[in-house]
Amino acid sequence: MTFEWWFAYLLTSTLLSLSPGSGAINTMTTSINHGYRGAVASIAGLQTGLGIHIVLVGVGLGTLFSRSLLAFEILKWAGAAYLIWLGIQQWRAAGAIDLHTLAQTQSRGRLFKRAIFVNLTNPKSIVFLAALFPQFIMPQQPQLAQYLILGVTTIVVDMVVMTGYATLAQRIAAWIKGPKQMKALNKAFGSLFMLVGALLASARHA
């Protein structure tokens, strides 16, 4: 893989990670409600889920999800239901302003697992990776090394972007002056979770 080819993938991966989705929403809500340490656990979970998708694509299972309507539909509806459930939970969240107290309500391990599930139940992610990776793989060169390069690049880029979203969320949290504003923010993010869940439910198999 040439540097130019890798740089083209880097730009593509960056644009994709910057696109707001369930991962970004999950990172921002976790950062606001559970502090930066909670966000770190969430980001680690997202990258774990992404890494699993990359491995599945590498061993050929990504093609199964891209070709099997049943597999796509099962994962799609599981993901949509989970995101809508997260949105409902966010709507019901207390409007407390003390982030240090909120950070104790869920362990970082639980936030980590939640983030893994958010990424794993997104069939569009694995289908897109299955379609994208081959476009940047040079058949005349060792494929395993190229998959590793693309996979590591994807994870590092997404980690940096999600860290940016977490930092932005922390700045938003600093503007919150009382419980009413926190509750309104929880409802806003809860609505976004449900919207993304609804959009995922309406997604059609290519």
Swiss-Prot record:
Q: Gene name?
A: rhtB
In terms of PANTHER family, this protein maps to:
ARGININE EXPORTER PROTEIN ARGO (PTHR30086), HOMOSERINE_HOMOSERINE LACTONE EFFLUX PROTEIN (PTHR30086:SF14)
Organism domain of life: Bacteria
Q: Its Gene Ontology biological processes?
A: homoserine transport
Q: What protein does this entry describe?
A: Homoserine/homoserine lactone efflux protein
Give the stretches traversing the membrane: 5-25, 45-65, 68-88, 117-137, 148-168, 182-202
Q: Sum up the protein's function in the record's words.
A: Conducts the efflux of homoserine and homoserine lactone.
**Topology class, membrane:** Multi-pass membrane protein
> InterPro entries under this entry?
Homoserine/Threonine_efflux, LeuE-type
